[in-house]
UniProtKB/Swiss-Prot annotation:
Mostly expressed in leaves and inflorescences, including floral organs and meristems, and, to a lower extent, in pistils. One of its GO terms (cellular component) is large ribosomal subunit. CDD domains: Ribosomal_uL14. The lineage of its organism: Eukaryota, Viridiplantae, Streptophyta, Embryophyta, Tracheophyta. It comes from Arabidopsis thaliana. Keywords: Mitochondrion, Ribonucleoprotein, Ribosomal protein, RNA-binding, rRNA-binding, Transit peptide. One of its GO terms (molecular function) is rRNA binding. SMART domains: Ribosomal_L14. One of its GO terms (biological process) is translation. It comes from the Eukaryota. This is Large ribosomal subunit protein uL14mz.
Amino acid sequence: MAAAFASRLTRGGRSLLGGLNNGGSMNSSNGMMNESILSQQQQRRTFIQMGTVLKVVDNSGAKKVMCIQALKGKKGARLGDTIVASVKEAMPNGKVKKGAVVYGVVVRAAMQRGRVDGSEVRFDDNAVVLVDSKDKNTKTDRQPIGTRVFGPVPHELRKKKHLKILALAQHVA
């Protein structure tokens, strides 16, 4: 794959990836590092989609979750969207266990999002707050599983009706 990608980005026999030639062989030891940095930068600025690992920023007991699906039929999730996730790391005495399928609200995303005043909000990591599954009989929104939310959360959650998360948050950005 790297050879096909590099062959499209060559200019006069010199690769823009810094060391990969048209044959796919390495010219320098720095070429593979440049390719991995390029792929990391591209991954960090995309939607939260299937396979994305997110940090859990509440005290529900989970540490890391992996996104299974973004709800509402979207191709990916952004700030304030609800996702279905699988718990990958958990505390031994937490409310949720490893391997459990949970719902979560995205409270921090590395992909930038424009605000009405022209500014843009972007966070350093992708983070989620776990919420309970909504019953069909109740008409209330999903409530957080934990009782504390760590770190900043954007005020755009107010538009998405996640007021309980805003009330539990330490800092609203």
